[in-house]
């Protein structure tokens, strides 16, 4: 199983061996193959959240080339569409899938491509979403749609979104948008979400800045 509330897909591992407290960075093996690295653990419950092999491979690839470009950052906040009353309000059918866009930064890649708050994303690159915003990956099984535009994509890649937008008459109109992924949701933020990546432009010495 996978978590669906994280920026990236994580393995949710149940282990018969009690994980070490604070055991981040421990290997997660399947057979004789490395499939992940632990990010956090819950020893009493014998559960571990682990970074996937996909992300590990991306970091290793960029380390070899010396060209770190990171992962796309869209900054989009979404919610699932399991409530039939909410679906009816949006002009959607009782069945079907997708996720509802709650809000997104105006400097992010999704907004620049035309996505707006209130839109419903029904598929990514032609892959349909269920009502919880999950896709059926042939190798990983049910996984968050984030996997398609965060985990497995690179800045500069283009994805295609099939969306629905509620019109003034209350009906839901289909649209197709192409999104060129980038990191503008981070780079355009006034508050640096990752201050540890670079040194601050000041020095504190003896109480003086």
For the regions a protein language model found, what residue spans apply to each?
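Solvent-exposed coil/turn segments that connect beta secondary-structure elements
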Residues: 1-2, 33, 40-42, 54, ...
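Active-site region of chymotrypsin-like
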Residues: 1-46, 50, 97, 102
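Extracytoplasmic
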Residues: 6-10, 23, 46, 71-73, ...
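PDZ/PDZ-like domain segments forming the peptide/carboxylate-binding groove
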Residues: 14-27, 79-123, 127-130
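Terminal peptide-recognition signature
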Residues: 24-32, 37, 48-52, 59, ...
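PDZ domains, with a preference for the canonical peptide-binding region formed by the helix
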Residues: 53, 123-162
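PDZ/PDZ-like peptide-tail recognition elements
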Residues: 58-100, 186-209
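C-terminal, low-ordered peptide segments at domain boundaries
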Residues: 132-133, 153, 160-209
């Amino acid at each position: 199983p996978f978590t669906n509330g994280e920026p990236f897909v994580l393995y949710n591992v149940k282990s018969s061996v009690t994980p070490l407290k604070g055991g981040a960075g421990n290997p997660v093996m399947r057979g004789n193959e490395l499939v992940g690295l632990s990010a956090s653990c819950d020893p009493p419950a014998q559960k571990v959240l682990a970074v996937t092999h996909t992300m590990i491979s991306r970091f290793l690839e960029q380390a070899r080339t010396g060209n770190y470009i990171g992962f796309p950052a869209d900054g989009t906040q979404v919610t699932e569409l399991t409530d039939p009353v909410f679906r009816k309000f949006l002009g959607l059918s009782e069945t079907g899938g997708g996720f509802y866009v709650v809000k997104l930064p105006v400097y992010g890649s999704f907004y620049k491509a035309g996505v707006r708050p209130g839109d419903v994303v029904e598929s990514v690159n032609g892959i349909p979403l269920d009502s919880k915003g999950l896709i059926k990956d042939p190798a990983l099984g049910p996984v968050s749609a984030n996997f398609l535009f965060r985990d497995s994509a690179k800045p500069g890649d283009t994805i295609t979104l099939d969306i629905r937008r509620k019109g003034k008459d209350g009906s839901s109109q289909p649209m197709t948008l192409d999104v060129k992924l980038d990191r503008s949701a981070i780079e355009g933020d006034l508050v640096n979400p990752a201050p540890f990546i670079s040194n601050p432009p000041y020095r504190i010495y003896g109480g003086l800045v």
